[in-house]
Amino acid sequence: MTRTLHLAEQLIARPSITPDDAGCLDLLAARLAPLGFVCERMDSGPARQRVSNLWAKRPVAQVPDAHDASKTAVKTIVFAGHTDVVPTGPLEQWSSNPFLPTRRDGRLYGRGASDMKTSIAAFIVALEEFLAATPEPRIALALLLTSDEEGPSVDGTRVVVEQLKARGDSIDYCIVGEPTAVEKTGDMVKNGRRGTLSGRLLVRGIQGHIAYPQLARNPIHQALPALAELAATEWDQGNEFFPPTSWQISNLHAGTGATNVIPGEMVLDFNFRFSTQSCAEGLQRHVQQLLERHGLSYELHWTLGGQPFLTTPGELLQAVEQAISAETGLSAALSTTGGTSDGRFIAHICPQVIELGPPNASVHKIDEHVLLTDIEALKNIYRRTLENLQAQALAAATMPA
């Protein structure tokens, strides 16, 4: 058994359903401390829903920038991940206990096998191998781990980022270990994500008997033209990195349950997934103006889940793409599709954020799994990425002014 597989199995065996870390961070901190990492717990949230957060950084001597004495030449690379997992679903539908890591048919089965405990294990072992070969690197190494990514994402990475920003800790590069591959580890890298903006709309009517519509006001009938217009709106055309912004209804509630009562109100939940061609403020303004134009009596509450972010080609993508090519022979596709991740918080303090992990076909599913070969390939890609960033740092140090 490889060290990566062994650590992955240790993590999967801990039933860390959000926000319970189930001891994962203690295990990882014990692994990082001998490598010279200073481990800080930044736990947050109410006692009954306490979120576990770990910030671990390996100090490195600061070297003045040869071209700008006011800056340092040492860059910081952060691995960001989450130890929490989603609930298992019906246990009887699993082929094996989801928290008893099981190997069969060349795969590792268990909740978190793909999302994302194998990514964490792969990066830890990649660090160990990298530091064994390069005990005094010219890059600073750090990890940001939380047990609140699959849940509200209020007391996890967001809190750590705020604390790092407040004390002036800088991050230059970040790899988020989310499962990004389509078929084989390395075939896709996420170099950005769309923003997410949710709204809850309450449309007020007047309840009444369905046989006397003249004595009532049906909020569903009133809202339908506005909803049709929202659904038909072209918000933007996207760009070379992002598809067009989309607006979707997720829930619609109205009525008393009786078939002879006109409802007094209608409640609608909707969501925008928006590109860098749009902004949250502009989308909010458009929706509110449209509702006013349709003469609705309404209340509208907004929740901004995250702004879009994009990492254009630079040092990190170059290091990652070279690592993937050397390890797998693949030319990674760059994509911004899919849901959101904690990268949306880290992008506030880090200019280069990418996501790289194993295939995502089984995430959140019954019998979640990952190929054993993908686990080792991911570890090697992470290690090669660190080696490439180290080579870049050495080259920059010797470059003439």
From Swiss-Prot:
User: Which family does the entry's similarity section mention?
Assistant: Belongs to the peptidase M20A family. DapE subfamily.
The record's listing under Pfam families reads: M20_dimer, Peptidase_M20
Positions annotated as active site in the UniProt record: 84, 149
Q: What is this protein called?
A: Succinyl-diaminopimelate desuccinylase
Q: Which organism is it from?
A: Verminephrobacter eiseniae (strain EF01-2)
Asked if Amino-acid biosynthesis is a keyword of the record, the answer is yes
Which HAMAP family has this protein been placed in?
DapE (MF_01690)
Per its record, the protein catalyses: N-succinyl-(2S,6S)-2,6-diaminopimelate + H2O = (2S,6S)-2,6-diaminopimelate + succinate
Q: Does the keyword Amino-acid biosynthesis apply?
A: yes
Q: Which gene encodes it?
A: dapE
> What's a single GO BP term from this record?
diaminopimelate biosynthetic process
Give the organism's phylogenetic lineage: Bacteria, Pseudomonadati, Pseudomonadota, Betaproteobacteria, Burkholderiales
